[in-house]
């Protein structure tokens, strides 16, 4: 595509996210249920701490999918009708890892709920980032679901390699999740 989308979303400390408690419950293993009261209280506490300290970032760009051909049978199948994609990385920042370690030392229950809160927040950042590309799509193009290293048979080790495609090496330490959104 001829248009260029710089595609960086940076949110500073104090960023608020409206997180779906059913999604948090799903990450904790609940099937269609709500968070139980203790988990809901821990989730609210974790979210408050995260909102006050983390710096969420999303960075990516559009590129040819030939770079990924042959890396995974499942990825090749996912890309079979595609000509280009959006390679992007998402992070809640290094402070998130520090909080998760601190929560692990305080309470494994809080650490588990905190991990679920982080996962839902990352999912929302991914969805928001991908939605930012919708106005740039040409007639007949659309987005497919994201496909990340670790999905299907795509080796999780590819995560570090995909990060090189979206950000300078010195920033990779803060980019724990890389995704490939597909244009069809």
Describe every region a protein language model picked out.
Residues 4-111:
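Active-site helix-to-loop segments that bind/position phosphate- or nucleotide-bearing substrates
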Residues 34-38, 42, 114-117, 121, ...:
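Catalytic cores of large soluble enzymes that bind and process phosphate-bearing ligands
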């Amino acid at each position: 595509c001829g248009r260029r989308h710089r595609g960086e979303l940076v949110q500073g400390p104090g960023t608020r996210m409206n997180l779906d408690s059913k999604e948090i419950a799903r990450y904790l293993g609940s099937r269609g249920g709500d968070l139980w009261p203790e988990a809901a209280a821990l989730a609210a506490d974790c979210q408050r701490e995260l909102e006050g300290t983390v710096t969420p970032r999303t960075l990516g760009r559009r590129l040819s999918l030939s770079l990924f051909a042959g890396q995974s049978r499942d990825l090749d199948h996912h890309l079979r009708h595609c000509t280009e994609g959006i390679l992007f990385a998402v992070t809640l920042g290094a402070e998130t890892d520090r909080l998760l370690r601190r929560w692990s030392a305080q309470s494994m229950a809080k650490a588990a709920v905190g991990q679920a809160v982080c996962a839902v927040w990352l999912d929302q950042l991914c969805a928001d980032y991908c939605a930012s590309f919708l106005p740039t799509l040409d007639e007949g193009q659309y987005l497919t679901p994201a496909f990340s290293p670790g999905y299907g048979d795509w080796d999780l080790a590819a995560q570090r390699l995909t990060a090189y495609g979206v950000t300078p090496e010195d920033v990779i330490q803060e980019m724990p999740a890389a995704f490939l959104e597909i244009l069809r």
